[in-house]
Amino acid sequence: MTGGEQKPNEIIGVRRGLFGVRGSGDTSGYGGLVQPISLPVSSNRPYGGYFDQVVDRLESVLAEQENVTYADAVEGVVVYRDQLTIHVKAEHLVQVAQSLRDDPQLRFELSLGVSGVHYPDDSARELHAVYPLMSITWNRRIMLEVAVPESDPHIPSLNAVYPTTDWHERETYDFFGIIFDDHPALTRIQMPDDWDGHPQRKDYPLGGVPVEYHGATIAPPDQRRSYN
C-alpha cells in the first residue's frame, strides 16, 4: 500500500549514549552514540488504499454530531510504514472511538489493547497512548494515538467502548503513569501496589544492588562508570 509524499520527520531532540541514559550511568562500555530523536508528522493526501476512505468517513460522521467536529477532535493523520495513525485530542477520544466502532462504513469493532510510549523530549506531550483498532467486517486496521503531558497525564478510558482495553489500560497506567479516567478499577496490574514510580518511563532509574563476584564488588547500574 502506498500513499502520498511523506514529509520529513520532526526532530524533537538528540539521543546521546545507549539505553536512553542521561548524564551518567552508561554501562554499555560505549557512550559515543549521537542520534536525532524524531517523530513522523502529518502525511499528505492521498494516504493510499482504504486509508482515505476511513478518514473521509470519520470526518463525515463527526460533522453530523452536535458537539464536535473533525477539526476539533483530530490533530493529524500519519501514514508511516503502511500504517494509518489518527492523532486525537484526549478530550474527544471516546467520541472518536465510538464513531469508529458504530458507523456501518467504519465498523472498527475490536481494540487490540493500548500501548504506552514515553517521549521525554516531546514537550508538553511526553506520554502517548496508542490504541490498535481492527475492523473484522472490512478487514482493516488503524491506530488511534493520544498525547498528554507528564504534568497532567489524564486520558479518558475506552473501557466502555472497547471492554478489551480493561487490563491493557491498567498495565499502561502501571508502567507509564497514564491515568485513564473513568476506568472501573485502575490499579497496578504487575508491580506491587506500593511501588514507587513507573518502570517503563525513559527517566526511570535502572536501580539494582551491588553484586560480589570473585572477591570484587560490582556496583549497581546507576553507580557504574560512565564511558562518555
Swiss-Prot record:
Does this UniProt record's set of keywords contain Membrane?
Answer: yes
Which keywords appear in this protein's UniProt record, sorted alphabetically?
Cell membrane, Membrane, NAD, Quinone, Translocase, Transport
Instruction: Please state the Enzyme Commission number of this protein.
Output: 7.1.1.-
> Which InterPro entries does this chain map to?
NADH_DH_suC (IPR010218), NADH_quin_OxRdtase_su_C/D-like (IPR037232), NADH_UbQ_OxRdtase_30kDa_su (IPR001268)
State the membrane topology. Answer: Peripheral membrane protein
Please name the Pfam families in this protein's record. Complex1_30kDa
Q: Where in the cell is it found?
A: Cell membrane
Superkingdom field? Bacteria
Task: Give a Gene Ontology cellular component term annotated to this protein.
Answer: plasma membrane
Tell me the protein family, please.
Answer: Belongs to the complex I 30 kDa subunit family.
Q: How does it assemble?
A: NDH-1 is composed of 14 different subunits. Subunits NuoB, C, D, E, F, and G constitute the peripheral sector of the complex.
| Name of the protein in question | NADH-quinone oxidoreductase subunit C
- Origin species, per record, is Mycobacteroides abscessus (strain ATCC 19977 / DSM 44196 / CCUG 20993 / CIP 104536 / JCM 13569 / NCTC 13031 / TMC 1543 / L948)
